């Protein structure tokens, strides 16, 4: 997802909920003031379809977890926020192994903003997204490698920054507006882009 929750595009929601019954969602986030009330925005579109939905909120920057306790999730959401904090928290081999295992089991993985960025092999961090106000290319989880993504493309007016960043990498950067997304297969190939 190119922006923040909730998912407002009904085409995206239908693609997620029509594929299978969803009983459990795991949301990975990082600690910030008043984080708990915000979490409802990630799940509200699913609650209307699945009223008995179980949801777990995990903050890997403040707690240790046993990933084996979360192998039954149908949907995994990686939240948005401070991109560099998300990268520092979630870009590691253990989390990568968990996400790949869950994708192979058929789980849907949804990243919002920072959570979407870190799914790629390389991460484009816009100058609008860091305190140094510099273009940064960082390592990600490597779930896709034939492109990078730019989030909040429209609201950040990121066209010129994206063009400069593309000179630093040898693959294209796909722009995602706040309410658009790319849908990938489990090998990281683009199935569809929804604007």
How should each PLM-predicted stretch be described?
Residues 1-75:
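N-terminal beta1-alpha1 cap of cysteine-dependent amidohydrolase-like domains
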Residues 83:
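Conserved Motif II region of HX4D acyltransferases
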